């Protein structure tokens, strides 16, 4: 099931089919959709024109939620690394949009510099103004997870009108801009503080039309007991039903997404299964990137077609000389009737039309005499794209599915969940770490506590001097650390990759667990000072 976690091929490279589909979509957009957008000023009413970076960029995940629901902690949990410039706390700590992306060195890039970078897909954020750009930044860091995806952290959503006004920019509009371009939207809720404020309701409304991308996470679920959790889950589903305008039920993942011990471990097994489901969704993003781009382009093309019919109809109804302003007001007032007339005349689905009230507001600021009449050739090219050109790309997409078995999100928490005895299915898989050789004479830092760990080791009844994965797992789970963390510890400790722990490897695992419980991080690769003395020659020869 997790075959894409196996390493192979150059990391970060896209399969040929993905590049082929992406380049074909860019060509179709430039030749058949963009001319129609420019002719009918689509960007002035909806989203601005797409650029190459919008097609070539990595899949993006948008993380949104009210303040102190654990958004930044969730991202750091996925990366198993702190994000430069981020703060974590019970108060509203993230006050800006942060694009967490891969970079060779750690650092931050301010928003004004970010929107002029042609290699980044953020150039079209410039119209939101300087107030927003001062609240937008990019955090770059070398992390394996970010080689496959980028993550957008958002400001904590507040309650009360004063906080909404004080932002100084159109927060829902910015969310809508990101929602159109990201591959996945994760809405975080706090199980211990469940509420949906007015601004959060408005923010969820801004995501309308992108419900297929939304995943809901009920975070901090380890803070409540089983019976309370069931009630919180029911209350969340009821609240979501009031603010999400679809009859379908959103997928809700329950868990505690941080690397600290579970406060109430009763539902540990549930949290493990939910985490694996969520991780599978995220891991599949690179494999389905081309399909998502195609889907979004078709969705955009259908909206552009409707927009062209609306604008050309308004142009046709305008008088040539007198009474232009009065006629404009009448047409805007009658816009719902015009929508219905266009729908019947051109056999268009009601779901393809924009929001009528918002369209009326936008039309007030435009001069109808500058609109263009219907241009059949442009619409014929668009129809050809939707009916023939897109259909020709489907075999390439199926080929991409076959070629992308080794492409997926790796590293961070995604790797730790599937290590050693923490693998849900199949035997342990040996994986190369690529550590540098160790010094045989270096002192082992675990030695001073080994007698304490040996007592625990022999109480667990090892067979032939080694603990099986199942026995070791039983003891390790008792520490209440998440499975993803314990999986990383197992990977670091099972130095000889035999799927078992001897006394030295068990002592190393215990040492790493204690370090984690004290708040320290885990190394990406095992430093030479931590390699057990008896394994140093074995490790060096294996490499």
Curated annotation (Swiss-Prot):
Residues 65-72 are annotated as: G1 motif. Residues 219-222 are annotated as: G4 motif. Changing residue 128 to A: No effect on caveolae targeting. It holds the Pfam family Dynamin_N. Residues 153-156 are annotated as: G3 motif. The modification Phosphoserine is found at residues 3, 438, 468, 470, 484, 493. Residues 523-543 are annotated as: Disordered. Highly expressed in heart and moderately expressed in placenta, lung, and skeletal muscle. CDD domains: EH, EHD. Residues 449-537 form the EH domain. It is found in: Cell membrane; Membrane, Caveola; Endosome membrane; Cytoplasm, Cytosol. ATP binds at residues 65-72, 220, 258. It is a peripheral membrane protein. One of its GO terms (biological process) is positive regulation of myoblast fusion. Residues 481-516 form the EF-hand domain. A motif (KPF loop) lies at residues 120-122. It comes from the Eukaryota. Residues 320-340 are annotated as: Mediates membrane-binding. Its main location: membrane. GO terms for cellular component: caveola; cytoplasm; cytosol; early endosome; endocytic vesicle; endosome membrane; extracellular exosome; membrane. Belongs to the TRAFAC class dynamin-like GTPase superfamily. Dynamin/Fzo/YdjA family. EHD subfamily. Homodimer and homooligomer. Interacts with EHD1. May also interact with EHD3 and EHD4. Interacts with MYOF. Interacts with EHBP1. Interacts with FER1L5 (via second C2 domain). Interacts with CAV1 in a cholesterol-dependent manner. Interacts (via EH domain) with PACSIN2 (via NPF motifs); this interaction probably stabilizes the caveolae. The EH domain interacts with Asn-Pro-Phe (NPF) motifs of target proteins. PANTHER family: EH DOMAIN. ATP- and membrane-binding protein that controls membrane reorganization/tubulation upon ATP hydrolysis. Plays a role in membrane trafficking between the plasma membrane and endosomes. Important for the internalization of GLUT4. Required for fusion of myoblasts to skeletal muscle myotubes. Required for normal translocation of FER1L5 to the plasma membrane. Regulates the equilibrium between cell surface-associated and cell surface-dissociated caveolae by constraining caveolae at the cell membrane. This is EH domain-containing protein 2. It comes from Homo sapiens. The gene is EHD2.
């Amino acid at each position: 099931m997790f075959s894409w976690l196996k390493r192979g091929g150059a990391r970060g490279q896209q399969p040929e089919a993905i590049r082929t589909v992406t380049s074909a979509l860019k060509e179709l957009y430039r030749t058949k959709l963009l001319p129609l957008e420019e002719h009918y000023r689509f960007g002035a009413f909806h989203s601005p024109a797409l650029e190459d970076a919008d097609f070539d960029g990595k899949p993006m995940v948008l993380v949104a939620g009210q303040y102190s629901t654990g958004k930044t902690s969730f991202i750091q949990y996925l990366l198993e690394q702190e994000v430069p410039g981020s703060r974590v706390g019970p108060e509203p700590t993230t006050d800006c949009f942060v694009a967490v992306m891969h970079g060779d060195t750690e650092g931050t890039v301010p928003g004004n510099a970010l929107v002029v970078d042609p290699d980044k897909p953020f150039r079209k954020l410039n119209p939101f103004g300087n107030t927003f750009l001062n609240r937008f930044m990019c955090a770059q860091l070398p992390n394996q997870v970010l080689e496959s995806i980028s993550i957008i952290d958002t400001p904590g959503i507040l309650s009360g009108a004063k906080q909404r006004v004080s932002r100084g920019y159109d927060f829902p509009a910015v969310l809508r801009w990101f929602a159109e371009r990201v591959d996945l939207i994760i809405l975080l809720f706090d199980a211990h503080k469940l509420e949906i404020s007015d601004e959060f309701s408005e923010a969820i409304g801004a995501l309308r039309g992108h419900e297929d991308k939304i995943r809901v996470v009920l975070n901090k679920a380890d803070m409540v007991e089983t019976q309370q959790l069931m009630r919180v889950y029911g209350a969340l589903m009821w609240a979501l039903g009031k603010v999400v305008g679809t009859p379908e039920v959103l997928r809700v993942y329950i868990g505690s997404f941080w690397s600290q011990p579970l406060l109430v471990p009763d539902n540990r097994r549930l949290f493990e299964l939910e985490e694996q489901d969520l991780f599978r969704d995220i891991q599949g993003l690179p494999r389905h990137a081309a399909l998502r781009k195609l889907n979004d382009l078709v969705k955009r093309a259908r909206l552009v077609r409707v927009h062209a019919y609306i604008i050309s109809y308004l142009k046709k109804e305008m008088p040539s000389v007198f009474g232009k302003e009065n006629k404009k007001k009448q047409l805007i007032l009658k816009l719902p009737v015009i929508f219905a007339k266009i729908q019947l005349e051109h056999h268009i689905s009601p779901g393809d039309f924009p929001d009528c009230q918002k369209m009326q507001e936008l039309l007030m600021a435009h001069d109808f005499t500058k609109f263009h009449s219907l241009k059949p050739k442009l619409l014929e090219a668009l129809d050809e794209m939707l009916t023939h050109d897109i259909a020709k790309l489907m075999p390439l997409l199926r080929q991409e599915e076959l070629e992308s078995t080794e492409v997926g999100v790796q590293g961070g928490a995604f790797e730790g969940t599937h290590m050693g005895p923490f693998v849900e299915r199949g035997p342990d898989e040996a994986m190369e770490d690529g550590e540098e050789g160790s010094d045989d004479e270096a002192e082992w830092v675990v030695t001073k506590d080994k007698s304490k760990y040996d007592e625990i080791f022999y109480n667990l009844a090892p067979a032939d001097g080694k603990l099986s994965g199942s026995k070791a797992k039983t003891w390790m789970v008792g520490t209440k650390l998440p499975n993803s963390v314990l999986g990383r510890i197992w990977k670091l400790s099972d130095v000889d990759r035999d799927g078992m722990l001897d006394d030295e490897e068990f002592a190393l695992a215990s040492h790493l667990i204690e370090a984690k419980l004290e708040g320290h991080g885990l190394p990406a690769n095992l430093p030479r000072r931590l390699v057990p003395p008896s394994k140093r020659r074995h490790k060096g020869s294996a490499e």
